[in-house]
C-alpha cells in the first residue's frame, strides 16, 4: 500500500466499570507498600493538569447534556489521549497535550509521559479492600507497519498490550474487541463497538474497573425501599435510600451554598458527595476547579452526622469526537491529522472517540475499624450534629489519595435512569 492510503483510528476512551461498596471479601491479601509523597513522585507532574481537565470536560458534558446523568473517568480519558500523543506530531501533538492542561514552559514532554507511567503503575498497585485495574490495549491492522519507537513507548510507559487484527473482516474484529472489553470490565460494559468498518487501522482501548468497600458500610436493614427523590425538572421518582449515623468528614461551602460529604473507601480512595442548594446546581458546576476541590478537602471537619444516600445504578456514553475538538483537540479528527509517529506508510486520523461508564452504589461492604488522626468532637450516636439527605440531584467524585487523581466524576440527576 502506498503513502496515500487512508485509514481510521478508533479511540475507545476509558470504558469504565466502577462498582462502589460491593465487595463482601477482600480480593487481595496484603496492603500495598507506602508510595512516595506527591512532592517526590512523577505523578505530581500530571495530577494537577488531570484535575483541571476533569472539570473542564465535566462542564462541557453538563452543558451539552442538560438534565441528564453525567459519568466518566477523567484519569482514564487523560491517559488514553496522552498515550495517543506519543504517535502524534506537529500541531496534532501540541493540541492534545495543551488540552490536557500541560504547559511546555513548565513541564517537558518526557516528564509528562514519565508521570503517566508512574500514575498507571500506582493505580494498578494492589490495595487491601479495593480492586482497581486500568489498562490499555491496541488492536492493530495486521498489514500496518508501525514505528518501532511508538510500540516500545506505549508498552513501556503505559503498559499497553498490542494485538494484530484483521479489520478486513469487520464483524469478526468487532466481536473480538467487544469480547475483550467485556471480559476486562467483568461483564459490566458490553457491545462497546457497533460500527466498525474495514477501513479501520487501529483501535485503542482504555478500560478501568473499580471495586471497593466503604470503611463504614450501610446496613441493608436500614434501607428505605421507596424514598422520594426530586428531579431537577420538578417531578419525583421513588428510589431505595440508604442511611446511617456515623462520624464523617463534612462541610458547607457558604460561597456556593453547597454541602460536601466525604466517605472513605478501604484502599486509599475517597468519595465526595456534593449537594447544591435549591436552584444552585448550575452555579456549582461552573465553579468546579482544582482549587475548589483543594479547598473542600482542607476544610471538612469530622462530626456525627445522619446520612441519606440513594442506592442506584447509572451509566453514560459519550461520543468524544464531537466534544474534544471544542476543547482544542481539532486536527486529530480531520485531514490535518499528523500521526506519523505511529506509521509513515499510511495517513491516519481519529474517526471516533467513544467513552462509556457504568456506576453501581449499594450498601454492601466489609466492615473495617475506623482509625483517624482528624480532630473529632465526641457526641452521642443518637444525637447527630447534622443531617444530610441526597434526595435531589448531586455530584459525586471518586479520588485516589496516593496520586491525587480524579478516578470518576459524575452527576446523579435521576438515580433510577440507567
Swiss-Prot record:
Pfam families: Serpin. SUPFAM superfamilies: Serpins. Keywords: Glycoprotein, Protease inhibitor, Secreted, Serine protease inhibitor, Signal. One of its GO terms (cellular component) is extracellular space. InterPro entries: Serpin_dom, Serpin_fam, Serpin_sf, Serpin_sf_1, Serpin_sf_2. Glycans are attached at residues 103, 213, 224. Residues 1-25 form the signal peptide. GO terms for molecular function: serine-type endopeptidase inhibitor activity. The keyword Transferase does not apply. It is found in: Secreted. The keyword Signal applies. Belongs to the serpin family. PANTHER family: SERINE PROTEASE INHIBITOR, SERPIN, SERPIN A9. This is Serpin A9.
